[in-house]
Amino acid sequence: MPSHRVFVYGSLLRGLHNHHLLHTAKLTRAPANTAAAEFVLVDSGSGYPFALAADRARASDARSPSVLLGEVYEVNDATLAQLDTLECHPDWYRRQLTDIEGDEPAWIYLMEDEAQCAAIRGDPTRFPAVAVPGDWRSHLGRTAGK
């Protein structure tokens, strides 16, 4: 059965609310991070992050491009299709290959919807960069008591 490598950085991480979708997946690298600092991770305000390619986010001190921290899984076709459905690929999030530091490339889901990207660019107060750039789990720990 064909397998696909997927890098997860938000609600699909171990212990978070969408991780159950990976119940048949094999964890192959944790922690893991993207090889290049070319992403911006912001809080959606709804319990999950938006990851954008740096060129789709407004550059500012609070939104400097960074690597993304997460986990890499090996998934089958059916699980990849479930993830595509969750992420509304290709209209809401777009699945693309990205390099993983010290490892083989993996699929990643990046915010694609232009209206949402425009809202993120236009309202950094509503969509703040995560407290530790690229690290959703640390951000959750910092915001849990607020």
Q: Which residues are covered by each model-predicted region?
A:
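Glycine-aromatic micro-motifs
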Residues: 2-146
